């Protein structure tokens, strides 16, 4: 949120695993948690909703959000649409909401969010929108579920160093957050979005070890983590889960 303009990256959403394996991708929970949180911090409209990619845990609440909240436009990642994304696009068409795919940058009151989209990959995770944002000399990097291959490609193409806040890729899975990548970007703070006692064992110990020189915040332990820039200072607030 900046000067009455608000951008949301991903909505969250919980996948249900209470059915046969072949049905798992078609069942998910919809809640109002995203809308409740946005209203609690004074946001009543989104200028842009960005989905990093089409997994339920990243955009499972998107349709509910669009149907019950004011959203001006939606940005999708590179690659082909899955069923969840296609359903959302149909809703956007009905509501005459603009949507864009595989963009390079987005303006926020004179500041730019850069989308580090190298190429189209053959897997959804590496097709994640990776977003770099710099404001008042503070650097933010949001990795979606991008894996080690894309991390390497990003380092080879972009001059990234001394990142202030890293949104760690793929919830702390060992398919992301390589030592090579972390040594290059040297994040001061690292945020891991992860559920308590999750079935995948995220974050992995190897990833936590790779991030040993970074200040790590985890949503399963720290709850909601908020970064605010005030008078050229970066403030951190947490709300226990």
Language-model region placement:
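Non-globular, low-confidence helical/coil segments that flank catalytic cores
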Residues: 1-241
């Amino acid at each position: 949120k900046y000067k009455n303009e608000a951008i949301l990256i991903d909505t969250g959403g919980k996948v249900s695993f209470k059915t046969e394996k072949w049905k798992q991708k078609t069942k998910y929970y919809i809640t109002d948690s995203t809308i409740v949180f946005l209203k609690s911090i004074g946001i009543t409209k989104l200028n842009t909703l960005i989905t990093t990619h089409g997994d339920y845990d990243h955009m499972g609440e998107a349709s509910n959000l669009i149907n019950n909240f004011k959203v001006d436009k939606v940005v999708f990642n590179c690659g082909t649409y899955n069923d969840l994304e296609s359903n959302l696009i149909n809703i956007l068409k009905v509501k005459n909401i603009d949507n864009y795919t595989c963009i390079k940058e987005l303006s926020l009151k004179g500041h730019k969010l850069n989308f580090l989209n190298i190429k189209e990959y053959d897997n959804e995770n590496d097709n994640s929108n990776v977003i770099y944002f710099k404001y008042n000399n503070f650097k933010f990097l949001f990795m979606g579920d991008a894996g080690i291959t894309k991390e390497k490609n990003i380092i080879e193409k972009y001059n990234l160093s001394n990142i202030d806040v890293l949104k760690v890729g793929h919830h702390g899975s060992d398919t992301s957050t390589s030592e090579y990548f972390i040594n290059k970007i040297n994040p001061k703070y690292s945020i891991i979005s992860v559920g308590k006692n999750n079935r995948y064992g995220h974050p992995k110990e190897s990833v936590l070890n790779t991030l040993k020189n970074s200040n790590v915040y985890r949503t399963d332990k720290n709850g909601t983590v908020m970064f605010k820039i005030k008078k050229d200072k970066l403030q951190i607030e947490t709300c226990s889960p």
